[in-house]
Amino acid sequence: DCKAMIAAAAESGAKLMIAYRLHFEPATVAAISQVRDGDIGEPRVFTSTFSQALDPKNHRAEHGFDDGPVYDMGVYPINACRQFFGAEPVEVSAVASRNADWGLDLDDTVGVTLRFPNDGLAVFVASYAMDEYEHYSIVGAKGSVAFQPAFGYGVGLEYDVKTGGETDHRSFPETDQFGGEAEYFSRCIIEDLDPEPDGEEGWCDVRIVEAVRRALETGRPQTLEPYARKRRIEPSQAMGLAPVGDVEMVNASDPSRNAD
């Protein structure tokens, strides 16, 4: 499906962009730039936990893996580690659990390990059966970067950079992340530019998620063909639109079982 959409866009001349709002979020873009510039040395290990307490009545609890925590939440750490390592993984391993007391008829918690060609490792957990939590860190030969919160919107993101025994805390104001990605895409259309998070970027994530599926089904690590993605997040993509006020939900509800 990814390749069909990429081909259709190329044939028609349409602009195709994956709506990855964090590709335009200032804190995320700044941290990726620091790691890319060598501030923490060669990146070695990425770790992340992303979880929520999903209500069993929510539609995402009804369709197994396809609506489960990996496709819903796991794509965030998958995309982040690919950007920080500046490479594509070559091996995928995964394990999963079902917490019987949670009432979800699916693997509600999944742990994934990605091996990168430069011996970098990414390890993350995505879960529908834990308290709401989001965090990631990347540790390099000379330092580390850590985010908490990491993937959400509605708050200003911040992170710590630790090098040489010193910690530099960087805080960024809240932005309208959805407006930022829309403005970026509008510029691409108006100025006839190719979006950075294009169809290929989405395909790179989907092929990893599908490898996670196979790893869970077989109980074995899955090998991915080496692949070189040439485009990555650039500093110029950071968008600083001011946040808007609270928006009323229409025919929707909070997916958490802890919602009031």
Predicted features by range, described:
Residues 208-218:
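Short arginine-rich
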Residues 14-17, 22-103, 219:
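Predominantly a Rossmann-like dinucleotide-binding segment in NAD(P)-dependent oxidoreductases
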Residues 5, 31, 211:
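Aromatic/hydrophobic pocket-lining residues that form π-stacking "cages" and hydrophobic walls in ligand
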Residues 72, 78-156, 172-175, 179-193, ...:
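Contiguous beta-strand/loop segments that form the cofactor/metal-binding neighborhood of enzyme cores
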Residues 167-170, 188-205:
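Glycine- and charged-residue-rich phosphate/anionic-cofactor binding loop of Rossmann-like
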Residues 26, 180, 197:
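Residue-level signal for the nucleotide or nucleotide-sugar donor/cofactor binding architecture
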Residues 56-60, 158-164:
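The feature captures the short pre-catalytic strand/loop hairpin that immediately precedes
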Residues 1-15:
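Rossmann-fold NAD(P)-binding glycine/threonine-rich loop
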